Amino acid sequence: MAGVYSQVTTGTEFWSSVFGRSGPVEIEIGPGTGAFLLQEAARRPQVNFVAIESSRSRAENLEALVRSRGLTHVRVVHAPAQCVVHHIVPTRSVAAYHIYFPDPWWKRRHHRRRLLTPAFARDVARTLVPGGLVAFATDVDFLWTMAIQCFVGSAGLTLRESAPPFRRSTRTRFEEKGLRRGATIYEGWFELPAEAGVAANASASTSTCGNSSNVGPTEPAQER
């Protein structure tokens, strides 16, 4: 996707180049086996979906499922999510992010690998369209606290109190494990205010994300 970004000037042009069509864009970070993504992509064909997965094997498996089901409006990216959102995703171009049961990285030496940071939350907020949402779920209480601190405290999103526009009808493997041990599930929707503006210097850079690569096609997939 980084190669496409260097050829266009707006978020609309960027995503149209990636998908070969216009439409709202939703991004799932850490899709795992892809249960949510595959179901939502089949249910809402008018939406363009991006899956960002840090595990190459999971990304390749998901890409194979996407292709086998003919979901031409889905792209799978193998890369660190923080890098993709910071360097590649254009400002005010994403309708929703889906972040379900991210790894808590319990060991102290692994804390730097955690997804949630104030900087990441601000990047997410920059890329959301006004009224855009971050759907977040976890069974780890401190991650829920971190989500509120990052998305509300650092990024200026609001914790939505009214009913969300969508609800998950699938459960992740980690969610199932949490429910079996009686864990509390924390779930919420963080919203960018409809009147949100854009900082004068807010933009994605054209840098690439290390040695990571797209598993999904960067050219629009052919209809089958």
Residue map of PLM features:
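A short SAM/SAH-binding and catalytic strip from SAM-dependent methyltransferases
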Residues: 94-114
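Class I S-adenosylmethionine-dependent transferase superfamily signal
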Residues: 97, 124-125, 147
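A short glycine-rich, Lys/Arg-flanked "PGG" loop and its adjoining helix->strand segment in the class I
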Residues: 116-130
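Class I S-adenosyl-L-methionine
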Residues: 145-209, 214-224
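S-adenosyl-L-methionine
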Residues: 1-27, 35-44
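Conserved beta-strand signature within the Rossmann-like core of class I S-adenosyl-L-methionine
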Residues: 130-138
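SAM cofactor-binding core of SAM-dependent methyltransferases
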Residues: 24-83
